[in-house]
């Protein structure tokens, strides 16, 4: 008997210690999902240049604050981190600096961190002088951005709690229009290199023939909840460029923030003590905006259209969330590889032409309104390295695959990835882990148009083919990852 009593006491102590452990520790020990989410403010000081048009303007007003928004997931074996930043496009060196600090402070591997820009056109530039040249010499705003991205992920990681996750999609074609059109008038198809294209971006209302590409109406979303059903975060994805309707000197996160705020309202998440984080990422929208070129419709007040679009997408996602099936045990995986692409270079004839453009008097009538801008861009690419290494990344969340591509990706590329993916559900986040310009397909390069111009597009014309191949290769590796 005297030997049994200590054994019973030890068993009781063991049970007491076990059940006194924090919930997130118990969940981790059982291989259950944990999740945390956070935001950080990345609004720059006034006076910084807002990019989004051909002429950057200094900010003198803030309509709504800019944020980094993060979700961290942990299946007990693998951690994944998502970060979406309200910015037009962020260079790889900024993300790399943030990822290194995050790995050091949280243990989340660099390869398991997906960072992207929303592509709002009403934010201060985080770009470097030449996207094709890697640099570690960051400017003040880039360093600030690094610190706030790190803070955001650290807080999300600190907030890890037992969670369940599900995903779904809904169709919303009403806001999507391919912006590349075949048009009648040759004068409407001029390019800044003295030639004439087959298609034009953002044409006028007259002389329209047909759009040159498709749209992708699918709104994909991932919903993360606590085990008792409280909304932790939603990550959505929609292939719409940006909306705009913002004065040129005003800072705004565009419809991406409207989505986040309205979804929180619909979920009544603002009433919770623990903050909900809504995120809308940009899909493959390089050739899509929400201008109906055949029927322009009513004129909008400032900020009105982005409010309308953001609220619509949030409402559609919210209504679809009721059909989501949640799970608290599933496989997370990540695969990341560098892909070397050739940088496009001007030939001798083009170099001669752009030098002639720059030699002309500035008051001389140009062949194309933006020819001087593109002459300078061509010369910059001529002086750039021969190739560039870009990151291609894929995440797995159960039977969902997520691709991350560091370009403004044409919609048909995203549709091809969805069609060929080994996962039941798939979406792509563009402008992820870098920002290297537009990514047309080879067939669209043959048509010309703004997105294909040397200086708008900066890498080899076969780049999209190589990138899709790499994405699918990484998807297959992710899908084979063991539990």
Predicted segments with their positions:
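Bacterial N-terminal signal peptides
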Residues: 8-22
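Intrinsic structural disorder/low-complexity segments
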Residues: 6, 17, 122-124
